[in-house]
């Protein structure tokens, strides 16, 4: 059988739109990309399972070989929306220029699947002793629906997992989590000339912000991980809106904030810290403060520095293992097995106009993936 060339895989992946968004006007689903991957994997001899988690939201699990353990190569098939006016290249076409592939998803991260398929083609699988798994998920860019569902329901037990997010081929063994909430204060509006006839939501929010800043300082003092460039949890007040006129008592105010916890801080523990920080204000103003999540919280993630996958992958890549501050699906897949994040392209290209993958990553990535397959499947 004549298989597609590497560039053909890449072209078809990029030209097949698979945007996920909390804005329904952008949200597309990933069925078409999953169906392409399924056909290619089957052509290479894989057993393929497709699961529809929600309408148009699919996960794919392909398996090559049999036995216990093995290696799981994982990634997401969705992309973020784009602003066409800021792109100099067609987002849904693979454009070659400046020794780069341009297009939406070239780095983050549909292109990773082309590398997996190319590496599989280049290996003689005759003496394989452990399975190779390929996981393609949905909705990483919004809710991480695919990875959450897979980790909670799968029956496979691979030895190790590699997630192919763009890390410039540097192995990543840890990252912070992300929690984002909205705090809405409902006051009582009225004319500013008579404050006693109203309840100023902005003034209540001022008390809330003071409590959050106290918590921010506590997090810096009490938690420290020297493996991170910013070695403490961060808390950021990112957006606030309230009131409509200087001569009117503010009747409503809303604040959006985020926290990036270090690995080891549980989501429940962080939520308890947040609630404890605000309990005095909530007791003072009963029924006027509502807290709602802006997205499903993502825990921090850390793979032990002593894990064999850490040392062997560092040797294969010739790179020191690092930690980062952005989030991936790793916290969920780490529940299955020791997990690293490692892939071609730079994270600086993710979510940017004229996203690209430099040609200089192509041969090294195929080589690294081939060595990982040999290491963990033979």
Swiss-Prot record:
E.C. code: 3.5.1.16
Gene3D superfamilies assigned: 3.30.70.360, Zn peptidases
Top-level taxon in the UniProt lineage: Bacteria
Catalytic reactions on record: N(2)-acetyl-L-ornithine + H2O = L-ornithine + acetate
Disulfide-bond pairs as recorded: none
Active-site feature positions: 78, 140
Pathway(s) of this molecule: Amino-acid biosynthesis; L-arginine biosynthesis; L-ornithine from N(2)-acetyl-L-ornithine (linear): step 1/1
UniProt cross-references to PROSITE patterns, sorted A to Z: ARGE_DAPE_CPG2_1, ARGE_DAPE_CPG2_2
Cofactors, names only: Zn(2+); Co(2+); glutathione
Subcellular location: Cytoplasm
Alphabetic keyword roster: Amino-acid biosynthesis, Arginine biosynthesis, Cobalt, Cytoplasm, Hydrolase, Metal-binding, Zinc
The keyword Hydrolase is assigned to this record: yes
Binding site for Zn(2+) 2: 108, 141, 351
InterPro entries with a match to the protein in the record: AcOrn-deacetyl, ArgE/DapE_CS, Bact_exopeptidase_dim_dom, Peptidase_M20, Peptidase_M20_dimer, Peptidase_M20A
Residues involved in Zn(2+) 1 binding: 76, 108, 165
GO CC terms: cytoplasm
Similarity-based family: Belongs to the peptidase M20A family. ArgE subfamily.
The protein's name in its UniProt record: Acetylornithine deacetylase
